[in-house]
From Swiss-Prot:
Signal peptide: none annotated. It comes from Sphingopyxis alaskensis (strain DSM 13593 / LMG 18877 / RB2256) (Sphingomonas alaskensis). This is Proline--tRNA ligase. It is found in: Cytoplasm. Consists of three domains: the N-terminal catalytic domain, the anticodon-binding domain and the C-terminal extension. One of its GO terms (molecular function) is proline-tRNA ligase activity.
Length: 527
């Protein structure tokens, strides 16, 4: 395969790769990971700040990624027999007051509506009308267990109505004090599944099914390896009996909780009155579950796959998997180039990858070809194809794989390929990019979970910015003993992430108490 070496690469030192490379971003990951993250969001045109504190505008490319997440996950949700529905944004305060642990867990984050009308005051400013105060305050949805529970209490009468499984795609509001786009915002988009069951075993099976759905989605679709496990008692969802999570390792070694699944026992059912008549004529409380994931996954994709040139978007969630950039020069050759590109676009769209038609964009915008190329590099389009007059004459295309942007020399890795050969291999190339991104992230995760740590303070202190996670053995203490451990970890800016479901059995003493350990728990810094 013949290489095309671009001359527009002006060298400067690359911390990561060694060769002299001019990267597309002004901030590198190693120099300032937090600033790099914000730079990727801006340069990849994913989102921007809005005029509302803690709320963001998700731009078309970012929302396109969310739509891809919705499309694939919605199919998985429906395959499990779950139906979509929609429930109110406003929830009466009394609904929350029925479940004390639940309201305590969310009280500090709740946005409250108290009036239903505005009037002009003596200075002409709009203020709430004192005569329009609501009889009962309404909470702007932080999560929907209470309002969906109220509906379930009407829908469930008999054992024949169970299991009842619903999901909604919606926005939620949690008044975050320290916000960061896609990771912590006062308003975010998500899906939340809610189910009711006749007994604990069926509800637990659903809880673990949802967890496995999230694990599979993260790894197979987002190319983001995760650890699935149960949350310690102090990290449980408010009011839950058990909470499970998937935890992903970002490139700075911090953990990102990317999805959760909760077994709620009968507490929420009792508060909402979700009862059913069993086969013998008796009445029992339902066992309920809830599970959800959100636009936070996009933040995870950025910090798992992004590089110093922007986002690298896994093909399965890329709004456009292949972008064709015609190299036009406002002359007589342009018509032939566009015809050549349209034929290429048509033939690529006829292909399937990952069981779906290949998503192709022919970029005919007014920007110069070089500007378009680097714009798509920063957005993370998996494959960028450039076509100029020489390519038309030779029956070729110039192909850039976003996961292999540079040659070993540090020059842009743009390769001449025969047009027919590129089309024949396009679907396989997309699948190879997906696998390559996952393998890279998997290697990083596996290499940075330490299982030999005996002193957390020593391990997580010092100058090293990247320390990954520690998997340690513990006795699963409760009450005051657990509270003291949480405070010790907090002083080190650490948290317990989860107890991995596939971890080796405990065979030593608890790192915190010295008592015989019963399981292993992941410790790390987190977003």
């Amino acid at each position: 395969m013949q290489k095309r070496n671009r001359r527009d690469v002006v060298p400067h030192p690359s911390i990561e790769t060694g060769p002299m490379i001019k990267h597309a971003l002004s901030v590198t990951r190693q120099a300032d990971f937090a600033a790099w993250y914000q730079d990727v969001i801006a340069e990849a045109d994913l989102a921007e700040e809005s005029g509302v504190r803690g709320c963001m505008v998700i731009k078309p490319w970012g929302y396109g990624i969310w739509e891809r997440i919705q499309t694939v996950m919605d199919a998985a949700i429906k395959d499990a027999g779950v139906q979509n529905a929609y429930f109110p944004l406003f929830i009466p305060l009394s609904f929350f007051e029925k479940e004390a642990d639940h309201v305590d867990g969310f009280a500090k984050e709740m946005a409250v509506v108290t009036h239903h009308r505005l009037i002009a005051d003596s200075k002409g400013k709009l203020v709430p009308d004192p005569e329009a105060k609501l009889e009962e305050p309404l909470i702007v949805r932080p999560t929907s267990e209470t309002v969906i529970g109220a509906a379930m209490s009407r829908w469930v009468q008999s054992w024949r109505d169970l299991p009842l499984k619903v999901n909604q795609w919606a926005n939620v509001v949690r008044w975050e004090m320290r916000t960061r786009m896609f990771l912590r915002t006062s308003e975010f988009l998500w899906q939340e599944g809610h189910t009711a069951h006749a007994d604990r075993d069926d509800a637990m099976a659903e809880t673990l099914r949802a967890l496995e759905m999230y694990r599979s989605f993260a790894e197979d679709v987002l190319a983001m390896p995760v650890i699935a496990g149960e949350k310690p008692e102090n990290e449980r969802f408010p009011g839950a009996v058990a909470t499970y999570s998937i935890e992903a390792m970002m490139q700075d070694g911090k953990a990102l909780q990317a999805g959760t699944s909760h077994y709620l026992g009968t507490g929420f059912a009792e508060a909402a009155g979700i009862r059913y008549q069993d086969r013998d004529g008796g009445h029992s409380l339902c066992h309920t579950t809830s599970w959800g994931t959100s636009t936070r996954m996009i933040g995870g994709v950025i910090m798992t796959h992004g590089d110093d040139d922007g986002l690298r978007c896994p093909p399965r969630i890329a709004p456009h998997q292949i972008v064709i950039v015609p190299m036009l020069r406002d002359n007589g050759e342009d018509a032939a180039i566009l015809d050549y590109c349209r034929d290429l676009e048509s033939r690529l769209k006829a292909l399937d990858a990952f069981g779906e038609p290949v998503r192709v964009l022919l970029d005919t915008g007014a920007n110069k070809a070089q500007t378009k190329r680097w714009g798509w590099v920063k957005k993370g389009a998996p494959i960028i194809v450039e076509v100029g007059p020489r390519d038309v004459a030779g029956g070729n295309v110039a192909v850039i794989r976003r996961d292999r942007l540079y040659q070993e020399s540090g020059k842009l890795n743009s390769a001449f390929v025969a047009k027919g050969d590129f089309i024949a291999d396009a679907a396989a190339t997309l699948e190879d990019i997906q696998a390559s991104l996952y393998a890279e992230a998997r290697e990083r995760l596996d290499a940075n979970i330490r299982r030999d740590v005996t002193d957390l303070a020593a391990h997580f202190s010092g100058e090293d910015r990247f320390v990954g996670w520690a998997e340690v053995q513990w006795a699963r203490p409760t009450g005051g003993a657990l509270d003291r451990i949480v405070e010790q970890l907090k002083a080190l800016k650490l948290t317990m992430r989860n107890t991995p479901l596939d971890a080796a059995p405990a065979d030593s003493a608890c790192i915190f108490t010295g008592e015989p350990a019963v399981e292993r728990v992941l410790i790390g810094r987190t977003y």
